[in-house]
Amino acid sequence: PHNIHFITSPSERVQLAVIGNRPSYIGFIPNPTEKVQLKAVEKRPECIFLLQKPAEKVQLTAVLKDPRYLSAIREPTEKVQLAAVQKNPECIRHIAEPTEKVQHMAVQRSPDIFRQIRQPEESVRLAAVQAKGEKSGTCPPRPKLYNWRLSETIR
């Protein structure tokens, strides 16, 4: 398996045999097929870091195992972004340009997360404010103050 980098164009069968023994060797395979990428990431999700352009299915597999693997993906598709943010809203900080839909998903799951969005859409800011208001219910009652001069409680 360790000689894979000496083969110019290994067949998919050879690639799969190598990955079956050592998933991390995917880094030595030039342009691995989607099937090979998937096998490596299914065995060891951290192999996503070794892939230049992982296929969407491979991205999803890694992110569903652990949303933090999103940080290894240069250009995650919206579907992958949504899957990661649905599992862990804080993953939005690893997305350079989250779509409005992804931003809304993150804010629905955790309203305070909008602070971690680089350029939140106006509708997302509004949704965050509304969500925070709904979670806290109505405004809390004003505290009673005691006026020492008048010796009475003021509302």
Language model: regions and residue ranges:
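Alpha-helical scaffold segments
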Residues: 1-155
